[in-house]
Amino acid sequence: MSNADAPSRKFSSSIIGIDLGTTNSCVSVIKDGKPVIIENQEGERTTPSVVSILKDEVVVGTQARNRILMHPRNTIFASKRLIGRKFGDPEVEKYVKGLPFDTMSHCNGDVWIRVDGKKYSPAQIGAFVLSKLKSSAEAFLSHPVARSVITVPAYFNDSQRQATKDAGRIAGLDVVRVINEPTAAALAYGLDKSARGNIAVYDLGGGTFDISILEVEDGVFHVKATNGDTFLGGEDLDNEVVKFIVEDFKQKEGIDLSNDVDALGRIKEGAEKIKKELSVSCTSKMEIPYICNSQGGPKHLCREITRSEFEQIAKKIVERTIAPCKRALADAGLDSSDIKHVILVGGMTRMPYVRRVVKEIFGIEPSTDINPDEAVANGAALQGGVLMGEIDDVLLLDVAPLSLGIELLGGVFSRVIRRNTTIPFKETQVFSTSEDNQTEVDIKVYQGERSMVADNKYLGQIKLKSIPPLPRGVPRIEVTFESDANGIYRVTAQDSITKEPQSLEIIPSSGLTEAEVERMVEESERLRHLDEMKRRKAELIVSSSELLRRPPTELERIPKNYLDRLGKVVKGEDFDLKEMEEVLLSAKKSMS
């Protein structure tokens, strides 16, 4: 669908739906009650989630992905795997060792990215991708876009969800709703198919895995349970293929490529190609000329991989999805035989091996009716339509993916909200002091399933002051957990004896401060202004060149000084943009 057709169409919703993916991202909008995928400026329906930063130039998408080999340290990919995470997380520490670009620990312990000495948060990198999607939508709709629904993996914790909202804000978007990716896919599938009964959404994307079990009935999409792994996806398979090729080359040639950044980048590019080809073919070949030099001269890499070999490489990754599926079924109180439909989401689900495993888990053939790369964005757009009141009789009831609670004496985790509790929710429990005459307490909030807080995710703390000095166990401290429809939490506390409003100091454990977000918003706006100037300059040069190629009889009507000045523009000489835009406009009027 061409963007050139956009002005003639009536679009019912100005809330765009965005799937901010690890590997690719996608944007959709509602037209006449149905979602429409918006192509980017390059005519692509999905945009690679890759950002290349060279000095002040920020390039996003395919053009950025093409720079990975030439500028590996300046080109950021799969930043979604780092968003809202700590640098010291074992998974993060292991993952960043294989990245060609630099990462670092921010002052609050979050993982950040460093390019040419400048520091960027993963949310800021995500914002660059969102800005491109926003621009694509504005070009398509022919009007500014300010509001969006953005999807996140169902198993994202509070920090990751908040960081995703920050990314939207930095990009100039009001994120009116954050919804889970599997729920969005189910919405896209269910509304289109008028599905009823229990649905499983198996979402294996570039960086994360989610499984959600939903009950769909008369437009109500009720998530019964969700499970997953926020560090499992196509990136891991690509890395396993790279290891396989590097080891194979070492055995054949006696040369170890594991520390050769350029070679690894080229092999990874080949791994991505093989992964796609083996989804439709039985064999694929990786051919990389001049992979390295040796004493005997340049070496070339050539290795054919069969689908059987590839599936053996993928086995341990794909099998890691089985246990979460079984846990989700158990949490939902269902057997696999109770599932009526299985929806596949994410590029990895194109693999025949993945589809076989899914069939073994649920005992039925998974549906291939929806595009696994576009379903999530379409579902987000549909949710935007619901919020706008353009789509009726639809209700989403999602759940909290992980338990929430506080730390008790001895580091014990006390659950207040159990996982798979329907959101939004509000729940209060009463606690007390652990010492005599204690006048203040630190209420530390955690998210997870382990019995000790040290094994769970620390979200932050509330300092409750002015508690009456009483014997331990006497004060009644009411701790209330609330969730909004985005799955983002708020925790409050008060002393029930005095019933006086308490001053709460919430100290976040991670994420961007308000000042950091404001600075990034300003930086994003500055870069958008620079991009706009570059676009206008390029358009001026093209338009001037086209005008100067008009027939001499037409050019005679244009003042000579206009033609001379436009000629200098085409030659690349310096010029004042606004002034020359006016000259071009005057020149065109002279011809009419």
From Swiss-Prot:
Function: May act as a chaperone.
Cell compartment(s), UniProt: Nucleus
Lineage of the species this protein comes from: Eukaryota, Fungi, Fungi incertae sedis, Microsporidia, Unikaryonidae
Gene3D superfamilies tied to this protein: 3.30.420.40, Actin, Chain A, domain 4 (3.90.640.10), Substrate Binding Domain Of DNAk, Chain A, domain 1 (2.60.34.10)
Keyword set, alphabetical order: ATP-binding, Chaperone, Nucleotide-binding, Nucleus
Family: Belongs to the heat shock protein 70 family.
Pfam families: HSP70
Annotated GO MF terms: ATP binding; ATP-dependent protein folding chaperone
Protein name: Mitochondrial-type heat shock protein 70
ATP-binding found in the keyword field: yes
Matching InterPro entries: ATPase_NBD, Heat_shock_70_CS, HSP70_peptide-bd_sf, Hsp_70_fam
One cellular component (GO) term of this entry: nucleus
